Amino acid sequence: MTDVSVKAQADPIAKPRSDVFLLILIGALYFSQGIPMGMAMEAFPVIMRQNGVPLELLAFVPLAGLPWILKIFWAPMVDNCWSAKLGRRRSWLLTMQTLLLIAMVLLAFVPATSANAVLMIVIMSVGMLASATQDTATDGLAAERLRAGALSRANALQIGGMMAGFMVGGGGALLLIDTLGQQYLLLLLSLIPLATIILVLLWKEEPQANHIATQGKARLLDCFRRQGIWPLLLLAFLYGSAHAGGMSITKLFLVDLGWSNQDAGWVATLGGLVLIVLGSPAGSWLASRKLWTGLTIGVFVVMVGLGTWGLLALGSLPVNWITVAIATLWLNIGSGIIAVCAATLNMSFGGSGKQAGTDVTLLQSVNVTGEMLFAGIVVWLASLLGYSTMFLAVACGGLLILVVARLVRSRLSPAALMPLNEDATGA
Protein backbone atom coordinates (compact mmCIF):
# COMPACT_ATOMS: atom_id res chain seq x y z
CA MET A 1 0.00 0.00 0.00
CA THR A 2 1.23 3.47 -0.80
CA ASP A 3 0.50 6.84 0.72
CA VAL A 4 1.16 10.29 -0.65
CA SER A 5 3.39 12.81 1.07
CA VAL A 6 1.71 15.98 2.26
CA LYS A 7 4.70 18.22 1.58
CA ALA A 8 3.32 19.45 -1.71
CA GLN A 9 0.15 20.46 0.07
CA ALA A 10 1.84 22.96 2.36
CA ASP A 11 1.68 25.97 0.06
CA PRO A 12 -2.07 25.98 -0.74
CA ILE A 13 -3.14 26.03 2.91
CA ALA A 14 -5.16 29.13 3.61
CA LYS A 15 -3.69 31.75 5.92
CA PRO A 16 -5.67 32.27 9.15
CA ARG A 17 -6.82 35.75 8.07
CA SER A 18 -8.33 34.37 4.87
CA ASP A 19 -10.02 31.47 6.65
CA VAL A 20 -13.03 33.58 7.64
CA PHE A 21 -14.00 34.58 4.09
CA LEU A 22 -13.17 31.11 2.83
CA LEU A 23 -15.45 29.54 5.45
CA ILE A 24 -18.25 31.96 4.50
CA LEU A 25 -17.79 30.98 0.87
CA ILE A 26 -17.72 27.26 1.66
CA GLY A 27 -20.83 27.54 3.85
CA ALA A 28 -22.70 29.41 1.10
CA LEU A 29 -21.69 26.79 -1.47
CA TYR A 30 -22.88 23.89 0.68
CA PHE A 31 -26.15 25.72 1.40
CA SER A 32 -26.78 26.28 -2.31
CA GLN A 33 -26.01 22.61 -3.05
CA GLY A 34 -28.77 21.49 -0.71
CA ILE A 35 -31.50 23.55 -2.39
CA PRO A 36 -31.89 21.47 -5.59
CA MET A 37 -31.89 18.31 -3.45
CA GLY A 38 -34.81 19.62 -1.40
CA MET A 39 -36.63 20.76 -4.52
CA ALA A 40 -36.24 17.45 -6.35
CA MET A 41 -36.74 15.07 -3.43
CA GLU A 42 -39.37 16.89 -1.40
CA ALA A 43 -41.02 19.97 -2.94
CA PHE A 44 -41.59 19.26 -6.61
CA PRO A 45 -43.06 15.75 -6.24
CA VAL A 46 -45.77 17.32 -4.04
CA ILE A 47 -46.26 20.35 -6.32
CA MET A 48 -46.46 18.16 -9.43
CA ARG A 49 -48.89 15.75 -7.78
CA GLN A 50 -51.16 18.62 -6.76
CA ASN A 51 -51.21 19.68 -10.41
CA GLY A 52 -52.37 16.24 -11.50
CA VAL A 53 -49.10 14.58 -12.53
CA PRO A 54 -49.66 10.78 -12.31
CA LEU A 55 -47.72 8.70 -9.82
CA GLU A 56 -46.24 6.68 -12.68
CA LEU A 57 -44.30 9.76 -13.79
CA LEU A 58 -43.48 10.91 -10.26
CA ALA A 59 -41.78 7.56 -9.68
CA PHE A 60 -38.98 8.77 -11.97
CA VAL A 61 -38.30 11.98 -10.00
CA PRO A 62 -35.83 10.30 -7.58
CA LEU A 63 -33.65 9.47 -10.60
CA ALA A 64 -32.67 13.14 -10.55
CA GLY A 65 -30.54 12.27 -7.53
CA LEU A 66 -28.36 9.77 -9.41
CA PRO A 67 -25.53 12.30 -10.00
CA TRP A 68 -24.86 12.28 -6.25
CA ILE A 69 -24.09 8.56 -6.44
CA LEU A 70 -22.39 8.51 -9.84
CA LYS A 71 -20.27 11.66 -9.41
CA ILE A 72 -17.29 9.58 -8.36
CA PHE A 73 -16.81 8.59 -12.01
CA TRP A 74 -16.17 12.18 -13.12
CA ALA A 75 -14.57 13.42 -9.89
CA PRO A 76 -11.03 12.90 -11.31
CA MET A 77 -11.93 15.29 -14.13
CA VAL A 78 -12.78 17.95 -11.53
CA ASP A 79 -9.32 17.47 -10.02
CA ASN A 80 -7.52 17.34 -13.37
CA CYS A 81 -9.15 19.96 -15.60
CA TRP A 82 -9.48 23.68 -14.96
CA SER A 83 -8.82 27.11 -16.41
CA ALA A 84 -5.44 28.52 -15.39
CA LYS A 85 -6.97 32.00 -15.54
CA LEU A 86 -9.81 31.21 -13.12
CA GLY A 87 -8.04 28.73 -10.83
CA ARG A 88 -8.30 25.04 -10.06
CA ARG A 89 -11.43 25.12 -7.86
CA ARG A 90 -12.83 28.46 -8.96
CA SER A 91 -13.26 27.19 -12.54
CA TRP A 92 -15.67 24.47 -11.47
CA LEU A 93 -17.44 26.49 -8.79
CA LEU A 94 -18.34 29.28 -11.22
CA THR A 95 -19.37 26.86 -13.97
CA MET A 96 -21.55 24.66 -11.78
CA GLN A 97 -23.19 27.54 -9.90
CA THR A 98 -24.04 29.15 -13.24
CA LEU A 99 -25.50 25.87 -14.49
CA LEU A 100 -27.55 25.53 -11.29
CA LEU A 101 -28.80 29.11 -11.66
CA ILE A 102 -29.87 28.45 -15.26
CA ALA A 103 -31.69 25.25 -14.25
CA MET A 104 -33.61 27.01 -11.47
CA VAL A 105 -34.60 29.92 -13.73
CA LEU A 106 -35.79 27.48 -16.41
CA LEU A 107 -37.92 25.63 -13.83
CA ALA A 108 -39.57 28.92 -12.95
CA PHE A 109 -41.03 29.14 -16.45
CA VAL A 110 -42.06 25.48 -16.92
CA PRO A 111 -45.52 24.84 -15.38
CA ALA A 112 -45.61 21.72 -13.19
CA THR A 113 -48.12 19.81 -15.32
CA SER A 114 -48.28 16.29 -16.73
CA ALA A 115 -47.31 17.56 -20.18
CA ASN A 116 -44.11 19.06 -18.78
CA ALA A 117 -43.26 16.32 -16.26
CA VAL A 118 -40.44 14.74 -18.27
CA LEU A 119 -38.94 18.13 -19.10
CA MET A 120 -39.04 19.12 -15.42
CA ILE A 121 -37.32 15.90 -14.38
CA VAL A 122 -34.58 16.54 -16.96
CA ILE A 123 -34.07 20.12 -15.73
CA MET A 124 -34.00 18.94 -12.10
CA SER A 125 -31.42 16.33 -13.09
CA VAL A 126 -29.25 19.07 -14.61
CA GLY A 127 -29.52 21.05 -11.37
CA MET A 128 -28.58 17.98 -9.34
CA LEU A 129 -25.67 17.27 -11.71
CA ALA A 130 -24.42 20.81 -11.13
CA SER A 131 -24.73 20.58 -7.33
CA ALA A 132 -23.13 17.12 -7.17
CA THR A 133 -20.18 18.14 -9.35
CA GLN A 134 -19.77 21.38 -7.42
CA ASP A 135 -19.68 19.33 -4.22
CA THR A 136 -16.51 17.61 -5.42
CA ALA A 137 -14.87 20.99 -6.08
CA THR A 138 -16.06 22.41 -2.74
CA ASP A 139 -14.80 19.38 -0.82
CA GLY A 140 -11.47 19.57 -2.63
CA LEU A 141 -11.20 23.27 -1.83
CA ALA A 142 -11.86 22.73 1.88
CA ALA A 143 -9.60 19.68 2.13
CA GLU A 144 -6.66 21.40 0.40
CA ARG A 145 -6.79 24.81 2.04
CA LEU A 146 -8.09 24.32 5.58
CA ARG A 147 -6.43 22.68 8.54
CA ALA A 148 -7.14 21.87 12.19
CA GLY A 149 -10.06 23.83 13.66
CA ALA A 150 -10.93 25.49 10.35
CA LEU A 151 -11.32 22.05 8.75
CA SER A 152 -13.77 20.88 11.42
CA ARG A 153 -15.74 24.14 11.09
CA ALA A 154 -15.94 23.63 7.34
CA ASN A 155 -17.45 20.20 7.91
CA ALA A 156 -20.00 21.62 10.33
CA LEU A 157 -20.92 24.03 7.54
CA GLN A 158 -21.10 21.10 5.14
CA ILE A 159 -23.52 19.05 7.24
CA GLY A 160 -25.55 21.97 8.57
CA GLY A 161 -25.44 23.99 5.35
CA MET A 162 -26.65 21.20 3.11
CA MET A 163 -29.39 20.28 5.59
CA ALA A 164 -30.47 23.94 5.73
CA GLY A 165 -30.46 24.16 1.93
CA PHE A 166 -32.50 20.96 1.71
CA MET A 167 -35.04 22.37 4.15
CA VAL A 168 -35.32 25.67 2.25
CA GLY A 169 -35.64 23.95 -1.13
CA GLY A 170 -38.02 21.33 0.25
CA GLY A 171 -40.26 22.32 3.14
CA GLY A 172 -39.59 26.03 2.68
CA ALA A 173 -40.66 25.89 -0.95
CA LEU A 174 -43.86 24.04 -0.02
CA LEU A 175 -44.69 26.68 2.58
CA LEU A 176 -44.32 29.53 0.05
CA ILE A 177 -45.61 27.98 -3.18
CA ASP A 178 -49.27 28.86 -2.58
CA THR A 179 -48.40 32.45 -1.68
CA LEU A 180 -45.79 33.22 -4.33
CA GLY A 181 -46.61 30.77 -7.08
CA GLN A 182 -44.07 28.59 -8.88
CA GLN A 183 -42.50 31.33 -11.01
CA TYR A 184 -41.83 33.87 -8.28
CA LEU A 185 -40.77 31.16 -5.82
CA LEU A 186 -38.12 29.76 -8.19
CA LEU A 187 -36.87 33.20 -9.13
CA LEU A 188 -36.55 34.03 -5.43
CA LEU A 189 -34.60 30.83 -4.76
CA SER A 190 -32.41 31.57 -7.80
CA LEU A 191 -31.00 34.55 -5.92
CA ILE A 192 -29.08 32.09 -3.72
CA PRO A 193 -26.82 30.60 -6.44
CA LEU A 194 -26.52 34.12 -7.87
CA ALA A 195 -25.18 35.31 -4.51
CA THR A 196 -22.69 32.43 -4.33
CA ILE A 197 -21.46 33.26 -7.84
CA ILE A 198 -20.71 36.77 -6.60
CA LEU A 199 -18.86 35.35 -3.58
CA VAL A 200 -16.75 33.08 -5.81
CA LEU A 201 -15.93 36.05 -8.06
CA LEU A 202 -14.83 38.05 -5.02
CA TRP A 203 -12.53 35.22 -3.90
CA LYS A 204 -9.19 35.08 -5.67
CA GLU A 205 -7.74 31.60 -5.75
CA GLU A 206 -4.04 31.58 -4.96
CA PRO A 207 -2.06 30.40 -7.99
CA GLN A 208 0.16 28.22 -5.78
CA ALA A 209 -2.66 25.68 -5.62
CA ASN A 210 -2.25 25.01 -9.33
CA HIS A 211 1.13 23.33 -8.84
CA ILE A 212 -0.67 20.31 -7.42
CA ALA A 213 -1.10 19.14 -10.98
CA THR A 214 2.62 18.47 -11.19
CA GLN A 215 2.11 15.53 -8.83
CA GLY A 216 0.26 13.66 -11.57
CA LYS A 217 -3.29 13.28 -12.78
CA ALA A 218 -6.04 12.26 -10.40
CA ARG A 219 -7.26 8.71 -10.97
CA LEU A 220 -10.04 6.80 -9.28
CA LEU A 221 -7.89 3.68 -8.98
CA ASP A 222 -5.27 5.63 -7.04
CA CYS A 223 -7.81 6.10 -4.23
CA PHE A 224 -7.80 2.37 -3.60
CA ARG A 225 -4.01 2.27 -3.37
CA ARG A 226 -3.78 4.62 -0.40
CA GLN A 227 -2.89 3.23 3.01
CA GLY A 228 -5.95 2.73 5.22
CA ILE A 229 -8.53 3.37 2.49
CA TRP A 230 -10.43 0.08 2.89
CA PRO A 231 -11.38 0.41 6.58
CA LEU A 232 -12.10 4.10 5.94
CA LEU A 233 -14.50 3.10 3.14
CA LEU A 234 -16.21 0.70 5.53
CA LEU A 235 -16.58 3.47 8.11
CA ALA A 236 -18.01 5.79 5.44
CA PHE A 237 -20.51 3.09 4.50
CA LEU A 238 -21.61 2.59 8.11
CA TYR A 239 -21.68 6.00 9.77
CA GLY A 240 -24.59 7.35 7.71
CA SER A 241 -26.81 4.60 9.12
CA ALA A 242 -27.13 6.60 12.34
CA HIS A 243 -29.11 9.39 10.71
CA ALA A 244 -30.60 7.80 7.59
CA GLY A 245 -31.68 4.65 9.37
CA GLY A 246 -33.09 6.44 12.38
CA MET A 247 -34.93 9.27 10.66
CA SER A 248 -36.39 7.14 7.86
CA ILE A 249 -38.22 4.85 10.29
CA THR A 250 -39.25 7.24 13.07
CA LYS A 251 -41.76 9.05 10.85
CA LEU A 252 -43.30 5.74 9.76
CA PHE A 253 -43.52 4.67 13.39
CA LEU A 254 -45.41 7.84 14.34
CA VAL A 255 -47.79 7.59 11.37
CA ASP A 256 -48.57 3.97 12.28
CA LEU A 257 -49.48 5.21 15.77
CA GLY A 258 -52.03 7.57 14.25
CA TRP A 259 -49.99 10.75 14.04
CA SER A 260 -50.86 12.92 11.02
CA ASN A 261 -48.49 13.51 8.12
CA GLN A 262 -48.26 17.12 9.27
CA ASP A 263 -47.23 16.05 12.77
CA ALA A 264 -44.62 13.70 11.35
CA GLY A 265 -43.41 16.56 9.16
CA TRP A 266 -42.99 18.81 12.20
CA VAL A 267 -40.93 16.09 13.90
CA ALA A 268 -38.73 15.83 10.81
CA THR A 269 -38.32 19.62 10.78
CA LEU A 270 -37.39 19.61 14.46
CA GLY A 271 -34.81 16.93 13.77
CA GLY A 272 -33.26 18.94 10.95
CA LEU A 273 -33.08 22.09 13.06
CA VAL A 274 -31.50 20.21 15.96
CA LEU A 275 -28.87 18.74 13.64
CA ILE A 276 -28.07 22.20 12.23
CA VAL A 277 -28.12 24.22 15.46
CA LEU A 278 -26.81 21.69 18.00
CA GLY A 279 -25.42 18.53 16.41
CA SER A 280 -23.15 20.06 13.77
CA PRO A 281 -21.60 22.75 16.03
CA ALA A 282 -21.02 20.14 18.75
CA GLY A 283 -19.38 17.87 16.19
CA SER A 284 -17.15 20.70 14.99
CA TRP A 285 -16.07 21.52 18.54
CA LEU A 286 -15.25 17.90 19.30
CA ALA A 287 -13.56 17.22 15.96
CA SER A 288 -11.22 20.18 16.42
CA ARG A 289 -10.10 18.87 19.81
CA LYS A 290 -10.49 15.09 20.12
CA LEU A 291 -11.80 13.66 16.85
CA TRP A 292 -11.87 10.00 17.85
CA THR A 293 -13.44 10.80 21.21
CA GLY A 294 -16.00 12.96 19.42
CA LEU A 295 -16.91 10.12 17.10
CA THR A 296 -17.36 7.81 20.10
CA ILE A 297 -19.53 10.35 21.93
CA GLY A 298 -21.67 10.81 18.81
CA VAL A 299 -22.28 7.07 18.50
CA PHE A 300 -23.30 6.73 22.15
CA VAL A 301 -25.66 9.73 21.90
CA VAL A 302 -27.30 8.15 18.84
CA MET A 303 -27.61 4.87 20.75
CA VAL A 304 -29.39 6.74 23.55
CA GLY A 305 -31.72 8.30 20.98
CA LEU A 306 -32.52 5.00 19.29
CA GLY A 307 -32.93 3.36 22.69
CA THR A 308 -35.45 6.06 23.63
CA TRP A 309 -37.39 5.39 20.44
CA GLY A 310 -37.29 1.69 21.34
CA LEU A 311 -38.78 2.42 24.77
CA LEU A 312 -41.52 4.45 23.09
CA ALA A 313 -42.28 1.52 20.79
CA LEU A 314 -42.32 -0.91 23.73
CA GLY A 315 -44.80 1.28 25.59
CA SER A 316 -42.36 1.81 28.45
CA LEU A 317 -42.60 5.55 27.77
CA PRO A 318 -45.75 7.43 26.73
CA VAL A 319 -45.74 8.63 23.13
CA ASN A 320 -46.38 12.37 23.25
CA TRP A 321 -44.77 15.53 21.95
CA ILE A 322 -42.38 15.79 24.90
CA THR A 323 -41.00 12.25 24.70
CA VAL A 324 -40.85 12.32 20.90
CA ALA A 325 -38.99 15.64 21.03
CA ILE A 326 -36.49 14.21 23.54
CA ALA A 327 -35.86 11.13 21.38
CA THR A 328 -35.50 13.32 18.29
CA LEU A 329 -33.10 15.61 20.15
CA TRP A 330 -30.76 12.78 21.15
CA LEU A 331 -30.84 11.12 17.73
CA ASN A 332 -30.07 14.27 15.76
CA ILE A 333 -27.45 15.69 18.11
CA GLY A 334 -25.59 12.39 17.90
CA SER A 335 -26.07 12.16 14.13
CA GLY A 336 -24.64 15.65 13.69
CA ILE A 337 -21.60 14.86 15.83
CA ILE A 338 -20.90 11.64 13.93
CA ALA A 339 -21.37 13.26 10.53
CA VAL A 340 -19.04 16.21 11.24
CA CYS A 341 -16.33 14.08 12.88
CA ALA A 342 -16.40 11.50 10.08
CA ALA A 343 -16.48 14.17 7.36
CA THR A 344 -13.52 15.94 9.01
CA LEU A 345 -11.62 12.65 9.00
CA ASN A 346 -12.48 12.12 5.32
CA MET A 347 -11.32 15.62 4.37
CA SER A 348 -8.12 15.22 6.36
CA PHE A 349 -7.45 12.02 4.47
CA GLY A 350 -8.24 13.66 1.14
CA GLY A 351 -6.27 16.82 1.91
CA SER A 352 -3.13 14.84 2.69
CA GLY A 353 -3.02 13.35 -0.81
CA LYS A 354 -2.66 14.60 -4.36
CA GLN A 355 -6.34 14.34 -5.43
CA ALA A 356 -8.47 15.69 -2.60
CA GLY A 357 -11.67 16.07 -4.61
CA THR A 358 -11.57 12.51 -5.94
CA ASP A 359 -10.65 10.89 -2.62
CA VAL A 360 -13.34 12.72 -0.63
CA THR A 361 -15.95 12.12 -3.35
CA LEU A 362 -15.28 8.38 -3.26
CA LEU A 363 -15.86 8.32 0.50
CA GLN A 364 -19.01 10.43 0.13
CA SER A 365 -20.43 8.22 -2.62
CA VAL A 366 -19.93 5.15 -0.44
CA ASN A 367 -21.57 7.02 2.45
CA VAL A 368 -24.64 7.94 0.34
CA THR A 369 -24.92 4.34 -0.84
CA GLY A 370 -24.83 3.15 2.77
CA GLU A 371 -27.48 5.66 3.80
CA MET A 372 -29.82 4.49 1.03
CA LEU A 373 -29.35 0.83 1.92
CA PHE A 374 -29.78 1.31 5.67
CA ALA A 375 -32.90 3.43 5.16
CA GLY A 376 -34.46 0.39 3.49
CA ILE A 377 -32.96 -2.20 5.84
CA VAL A 378 -34.46 -0.64 8.98
CA VAL A 379 -37.93 -0.64 7.38
CA TRP A 380 -37.48 -4.32 6.51
CA LEU A 381 -36.32 -5.08 10.06
CA ALA A 382 -39.34 -3.25 11.48
CA SER A 383 -41.68 -5.39 9.39
CA LEU A 384 -39.83 -8.54 10.46
CA LEU A 385 -39.12 -7.84 14.15
CA GLY A 386 -41.46 -5.01 15.09
CA TYR A 387 -40.55 -1.41 15.82
CA SER A 388 -39.30 -1.89 19.37
CA THR A 389 -36.89 -4.73 18.59
CA MET A 390 -35.70 -2.96 15.46
CA PHE A 391 -34.90 0.28 17.31
CA LEU A 392 -32.99 -1.55 20.04
CA ALA A 393 -31.14 -3.75 17.54
CA VAL A 394 -30.05 -0.76 15.46
CA ALA A 395 -28.95 1.01 18.66
CA CYS A 396 -26.69 -1.92 19.55
CA GLY A 397 -25.42 -1.92 15.97
CA GLY A 398 -23.81 1.44 16.69
CA LEU A 399 -21.03 -0.46 18.44
CA LEU A 400 -19.94 -1.75 15.04
CA ILE A 401 -19.17 1.83 14.00
CA LEU A 402 -16.83 2.15 16.99
CA VAL A 403 -15.07 -1.13 16.15
CA VAL A 404 -14.48 0.01 12.57
CA ALA A 405 -13.34 3.45 13.78
CA ARG A 406 -10.64 1.80 15.91
CA LEU A 407 -9.57 -0.22 12.88
CA VAL A 408 -9.37 2.96 10.78
CA ARG A 409 -7.26 4.67 13.42
CA SER A 410 -4.81 1.78 13.52
CA ARG A 411 -4.47 1.54 9.73
CA LEU A 412 -4.20 5.20 8.70
CA SER A 413 -0.71 6.59 8.25
CA PRO A 414 0.36 9.64 10.31
CA ALA A 415 0.47 11.64 7.06
CA ALA A 416 -3.27 11.09 6.54
CA LEU A 417 -4.00 12.91 9.79
CA MET A 418 -1.48 15.73 9.42
CA PRO A 419 -4.16 18.25 8.28
CA LEU A 420 -5.56 17.90 11.81
CA ASN A 421 -3.65 19.20 14.78
CA GLU A 422 -2.32 16.80 17.39
CA ASP A 423 -5.07 17.50 19.90
CA ALA A 424 -7.84 16.80 17.42
CA THR A 425 -6.62 13.29 16.78
CA GLY A 426 -6.25 12.42 20.43
CA ALA A 427 -8.12 9.69 22.21
Spans of features found by a protein language model:
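Helix-to-loop junctions at the C-terminal end of transmembrane segments
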Residues: 70-87, 278-293, 382
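Juxtamembrane intracellular "pre-TM" segments in multi-pass secondary transporters
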Residues: 7-19, 205-233, 427
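Helix-loop boundary and gating motifs at the non-cytosolic
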Residues: 11-65, 230-235, 239-257
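Glycine-rich segments within core transmembrane alpha-helices of 12-TM secondary carriers
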Residues: 71, 152-171, 364-375
